[in-house]
Amino acid sequence: MKLSEKIINTILLGILSLTIHVSFAYSAEITLDLSYYNYEEPNFMSDTSDPAFISLGVKNWDLPKNSDSVWNFLYTTELSKGWVSYSGSGTLDKDYYKLRGETYLGYKIEDFISIIGMGYRWLYDDSGGSVSSTGALGYDRKNQLFYVPVGGILDLTDKLRIKGQYNYLILGTQTSYLSDVAGFTDVTNEQRFGWGTDFTLDYKIDNKTSVYSFARYWDIANSDTATGTFAGVLLFQAFEPANTTAEVGIGISYNF
């Protein structure tokens, strides 16, 4: 892990821990959702959910009801498991694991809360030890994205709310565990350019229960080039191709 990634990771986890601790004193929601997922590297490969991703999380998007302050810390956390079908060098079924955490500083103006914060997404592709339909050997992959979410939360009615944000990529790292294939060394690439969007529509059934739908998207440019070795001697260079990720899902939340 490079120094820049360590610094960002430490700051983000510290802010997120403090935010969750403070926010639990006011209110929080448990979330459960199912989603469609598609990751694509054009002309190279694609990973598509088969059948779906399932996610469990905790969030707080509300300001304290009895507070006179227009400022507050809000957050979203989520852990996901996905069953994925790979298409590229043949076909392959595998598992995905995903962790997403975002913390925001919110400012309320009537029915609108503007937000800006820090976000982190960790994604693990568990392909090591697998063999595709054409005999290609699989290897594990880990992706980390550090980003700044900017957007807002608007209460359209007492029951209907929409949240939208633009995600500005600060740093991405892609680790390919090529050592899963005998003779190769692992390779880590940095991703410097990219952006994403995230929209959620939330409908309150009663004071405790809500249903929601969401759509998320990432567009990441080519990474830098890193050097690896084979059999301890032969050098090779590798980069992570430009890629897109799309997610669409529905869920239910409970306020406690």
Listing of model-derived features with the role each one plays in the protein:
Residues 25-89, 253-255:
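Short glycine/proline- and aromatic-enriched beta-strand/turn motifs that initiate or cap beta-hairpins
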Residues 28-34, 56, 73-79, 103, ...:
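Membrane-embedded beta-strand positions of outer-membrane beta-barrel proteins
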Residues 34-40, 77-85, 109, 118-126, ...:
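Transmembrane beta-strands of outer-membrane beta-barrel pores
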